[in-house]
Amino acid sequence: MADSVTIGQLEKLSVQCDKENQHVENKENNINSDNINLLEATKTTLPIPNTSNTNPPMNQSSSPTTTTTTPTTTTTPTTAEPAKKRKIFAKLHLLNRDGSVKNYFEMKKTKLIIGSDTELADIQVVRPGIYPKHVEIIYDKEKKKFYLNPLIDPKDSDNVRLNFVPFLHKKEVLGNGDIISIGFRSIKMEFIEKVTVDQLVQPEKQYIPSNTPTCITNTPIQTPPTTSPPSSTTTNKKDNTSTNVTKKPIATVPSTTTSTKKSSVVPESKPATKTITKETPKPTKTTTTTTVTTSKPTVKPTAVKKSINDDDYGDDYNEEEDDDDEEEEEEEEEEEEEEEVESKQIKVVNSKPNDDDMSCKKPMKYTNTNEEMRKSLASNVGGINSKIISKGDSVRNLLPISSRRPTAPVTPTKPTSTKKVTTPKKATVVKPPKESKVPKVPKVPKVPKAAVVASIDENGKEDYIRLISFKKAKDIVKAFQSHEKLVKSKNNGHGNISNEKKEILKCFEVLDQINWRLSTDKPGDSRPISSYFKNIPSLSEFDSELLTDYYSMISEPMSINSILSSVIYTADYNIDNCLDDFNQVLENSMTYNSENSIIYWLAHYCKIELYKALSNSGIIQNKLYLDIKKDSETFLKSIGTQLKGDGISLPQIIAQSVSKNKEQTVPQEEDEEEEEEEEEEEEEEEEGEEGKEDEEEEEKEEEEGEENEEEEDVEIDDCEIDQESDDDQ
């Protein structure tokens, strides 16, 4: 009975536990209904009651109820994960003008875009000429390198500079501390992520030693003969008789000489040109003799070795041409030092003739110095070559590019020898003046200025001109030529237009009837004043470079044929539109050409003639024509003075030719008479100009004759003064 009672009590307790657990689950489901993951977590953490666990006693049955509720309170905070910190690859420091750091930006992704757009770009730079996506900085995780990639056209890449180097047209590798300039805004890179650096291997420099010992060989080598001043000493033989023995000047012996018994004493490591002097007893007397020395002949070697630093010279450039003067000066200084040493030794010997020690030591010392000089020259068979190479390897100031002589033939000079007599005074040798070998640079003809990258407008701001491509320039020409051809193809369809437009067309035809030519042209060579403005520039007149420059500078091209086609085929095209387009034609020509040009002059002259024709036809008021004429004539005068100053002749306006329209009829006889009169007037003007030139030449000749007479008078006076001084002496 006791067992059944306990079993019943345990069943009641289990039912209560199940109810409590269900109540807790309902509360948690209501609280966390929005989060499905938390619901599943709470369900898994709550234990399901086991019916098999009915045997434990009463004190142990209450413990599962407390343990099951505790996990539910601890599961909720564990599901919220903390936000991960993003990796920083580099820092971009924004610099001020003085180089100080203004602010910095952390690069937290592998690609960073810099531009003017606030949405597309990570860093905004609002400056003129900056595109929405201007440049990007990339970090390659595989190669572990940072790259700078410009996203704009290479022609506009002057806005992007790496370490102040402009015109970046491809992806460049960045280094730690590099400065990126975008629209004159400097950004300094600081790497935080590890970067691999490519180790640059410099090429090995092969230096040639200037003085290397040479062994005796049987190969003939051409060496310039070098002479040394002979030393004269008197030696005593066994019979104590004094004889004068003069040593001949020693010359460098070619290495083709065969070794004899006497020369077998010379060791192999020393050059063959060394001479051995026999030991002589102490002399009792010394005599001095004046010796004549010959300077070393300057012989240019056949093959000159170039220095490593001479990469910028041409193939035909010779180092010896630049160092001839220095070599001659050094040789003269060496000779003068030798002469001073000789004079000092002679004075010492003459002052103490009976001193045996001094008489022995001084000549021996003199011979030793000569032998040392011969050793230094003979140590390298090409002594002169080694001297030139040693100078070539030294640091020197290079000639400017304009003064270098490209492809100048090297002409070897003949060896010259100058004799000098040893005297206590220094002998001065007068050198003939050298002719300047620098060729005259021809003057470069003036070329019209190309498109500028930036210009300053009236307000002082920079106005950037963007260069267009050659393809775009050709498209502009093609579009305008199709519009210009309408005038030629449908020129007979003028009947449908208004009378005002017909008068406008007649006024433009006046520009075709007025011709001009230069004084240097032939009498029959003339062209209309509107020839330069008839069509827009095309490939028939310009090359590809000038064509792109023209249409980069001229944003609104216009021509007279385009105006005529608009007059004929555009209904609402009136006189105001026509004058605006005509002024645009002249403005384009004056923008591209300089002020002191013939086209600039013709533009103002065409303007006067067109407004004059429009005023005569009554389309515009006469006051407007007079104002335009006054302004344009002042321009014509100033341009004319500039052209005369530059030596350019002004265009000569020829009378109007016969009109091509059938409505206007001009008799041919009158035209011929007018042409003859004009030709006669032109001939008279040319004769008058020639007469003026002849008079100017005669005046110049007379002035030169007077100057020559004055010079002769001065020479005669000088001769008389010299004669008087001679008579006085």
UniProtKB/Swiss-Prot annotation:
Return the Low complexity bias intervals.
46-79, 208-221, 229-275, 283-306, 406-431
Q: Which UniProt keywords apply?
A: Bromodomain, Coiled coil
* Region described as Disordered: 46-83, 208-361, 403-442, 659-729
In terms of Pfam families, this protein maps to: Bromodomain (PF00439)
Signal peptide bounds: none
Q: Please give the SMART domains that the UniProt record associates with this protein.
A: BROMO
Using the record's annotation, list all stretches that form the FHA domain. 112-167
InterPro entries listed in its UniProt record: Bromodomain (IPR001487), Bromodomain-like_sf (IPR036427), SMAD_FHA_dom_sf (IPR008984)
| Protein name per its UniProtKB record | Bromo and FHA domain-containing protein DDB_G0267958
Q: Which residues form a coiled coil?
A: 315-352, 659-718
Q: Where is the Bromo domain?
A: 498-617
Q: Where is the composition biased (Acidic residues)?
A: 310-341, 668-729
